[in-house]
Amino acid sequence: ALLLDAAAQVGGDIISAGGTGTSDINTWASEIQAGTFLLGDTQYQRLDLPFRQAIFLECSILSKGDGYVVANAGLKALGMDHGDPRWPEGQVMFCSDEHTTLVPDAEQRIELDQRIRLVPAHLDPTVARHETMWLVDGTEVVDEFPVDLRHW
């Protein structure tokens, strides 16, 4: 109501408000400031919005133990303010500075040096920790984009 009152006082054709998380319920804004929908993160997947997650952190398996594996990506590579990343092939057990310990699902056969994809819980701070984003189609690299959010 406050924003609608301000728009009535100031005038103009555009009332810009909201974001990805309210894009499906905001009926009064004429422009939605939805940005995360493009790549998604686990927070928005929980809202059951009509967008599919399209960002992953690719990493490699460094070691194997009895019932667990360790990947070469941890707190320094992931935005952790919304919790642990998700791993579709199993469960995330623990994230340390540079590694993530994972428990594979029983049917998974994970090998050393195997590349896996972690699903970031929060997109923005994860992207800000990297210098390049890679656009892939399956396993093929299609393009790359520099990231200018580093060190923000």
Residue ranges of predicted features:
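Active-site loop/helix belt of alpha/beta enzymes
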Residues: 1-49
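Conserved active-site and cofactor/substrate-binding residues in soluble primary-metabolism enzymes
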Residues: 2-5, 53-56, 97
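Residue-identity detector for glutamine
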Residues: 9, 33, 43-45, 53, ...
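Generic structural signal for short, flexible, solvent-exposed coil/loop and linker residues
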Residues: 21, 27-28, 46, 50-51, ...
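Internal helical hairpin/lid segments
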Residues: 36-85
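C-terminal accessory subdomain/extension
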Residues: 64-152
